[in-house]
């Protein structure tokens, strides 16, 4: 279980795999796609499993949202939006400088929750287009023990992306550490016959709501399963269950898989590359849409 800072993930994960260990990593899998790709290939060549956070898409809230989509309640999804906006971690984190270095920023730090949620709902991403800015080149720290120190910002702090999914939905994703206050939703899916309101993908619960075109009010969706609060470790439990089952280890059979994490990493790097080049980027990876969580996984 790798809980090191993002810049160390590739090195630590590689060392564990080379020592013959299965690996479950904090997100992101690595800070660039080639390092992530090498980790997935290394795991496959050693007949080992590699998994990666986040696993919040396995929680009761996003499992309920998935069930709504799979049931066709809002019709075919046409578009979606997701927003992770705030004012940055320097007001609460004791040592927040790494949040403003390559491999972090709002996209790499919190973006994996949102991108993993979207891939869980829609499947793999085909291409991205984006713009990005560094809101302030230096940011003061407001938390102890480094209060008053300045952080040199070297990665974008406001990123706006358009995601083109293989399955079709045109999706907007905004991640930002430059928003003092906002009333934007965490996420919404717009179907042919209704809208699905998504929960915070950095949590395991709700609320999940739906409103059809002929309905005057939003109605709550019952959550799916028992994992509503503080259920971090579901992805690791799912991977452990796969290992115990004796299933072939050459495929990403567990849900929070290395293939999923690599695809999310590819999407994030492609977003930043698109913003820098001011042009569309086609992703070079893909993954399976994770299967819904079965009730026995974390038993």
Predicted feature descriptions by range:
Residues 48, 75-79, 273-299:
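C-terminal capping/lid region of NAD(P)-dependent oxidoreductase domains
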Residues 25, 31, 50-52, 173, ...:
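Hydrophobic residues in well-ordered beta-strands that form the structural core
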Residues 19-21, 46-48, 169-170:
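A short helix->loop->beta-strand "cap" motif at the edges of active sites that frequently abuts
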Residues 4-5, 73, 175:
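Short glycine-/small-residue-rich Rossmann-like dinucleotide-binding loops
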Residues 220-224, 242-264, 283:
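Glycine- and charged-residue-rich phosphate/anionic-cofactor binding loop of Rossmann-like
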Residues 1-42:
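Beta-loop-alpha module in the N-terminal Rossmann-like domain of NAD(P)-dependent dehydrogenases
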Residues 56-152, 278:
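Predominantly a Rossmann-like dinucleotide-binding segment in NAD(P)-dependent oxidoreductases
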Residues 116-204, 233-250, 270-271, 288-299:
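Contiguous beta-strand/loop segments that form the cofactor/metal-binding neighborhood of enzyme cores
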């Amino acid at each position: 279980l790798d809980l090191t800072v993002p810049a160390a993930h590739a090195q630590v994960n590689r060392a564990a795999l080379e020592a013959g260990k299965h690996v479950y990593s904090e997100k992101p899998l690595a800070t660039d796609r080639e390092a992530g790709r090498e980790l997935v290939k290394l795991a496959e060549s050693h007949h080992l499993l590699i998994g990666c956070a986040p696993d919040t898409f396995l929680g009761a809230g996003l499992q309920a949202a998935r069930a709504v989509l799979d049931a066709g309640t809002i019709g075919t999804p046409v578009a979606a939006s997701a927003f992770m906006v705030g004012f940055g971690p320097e007001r609460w984190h004791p040592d927040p400088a790494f949040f403003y270095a390559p491999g972090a920023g709002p996209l790499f730090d919190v973006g994996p929750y949102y991108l993993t949620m979207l891939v869980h709902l829609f499947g793999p991403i085909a291409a991205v287009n984006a713009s990005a800015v560094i809101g302030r080149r230096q940011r003061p720290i407001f938390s102890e023990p480094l209060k008053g120190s300045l952080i040199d910002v070297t990665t974008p702090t406001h990123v706006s992306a358009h995601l083109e999914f293989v399955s079709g939905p045109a999706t907007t994703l905004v991640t930002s550490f430059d928003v003092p206050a906002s009333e934007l939703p965490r996420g919404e899916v717009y179907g042919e016959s209704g809208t699905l309101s998504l929960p915070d993908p950095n949590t395991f619960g709700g609320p999940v709501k739906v409103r059809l075109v002929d309905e005057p009010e939003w109605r709550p969706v019952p959550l799916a399963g028992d994992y509503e609060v503080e259920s971090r470790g579901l992805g690791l439990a799912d991977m452990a269950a796969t290992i115990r089952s004796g299933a072939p280890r050459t495929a990403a059979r567990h849900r929070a898989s290395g293939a999923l994490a690599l695809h999310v990493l590819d999407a994030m790097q492609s977003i930043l590359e698109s913003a820098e080049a001011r042009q569309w980027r086609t992703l070079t990876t893909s993954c399976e849409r994770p299967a819904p969580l079965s009730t026995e996984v974390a038993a």
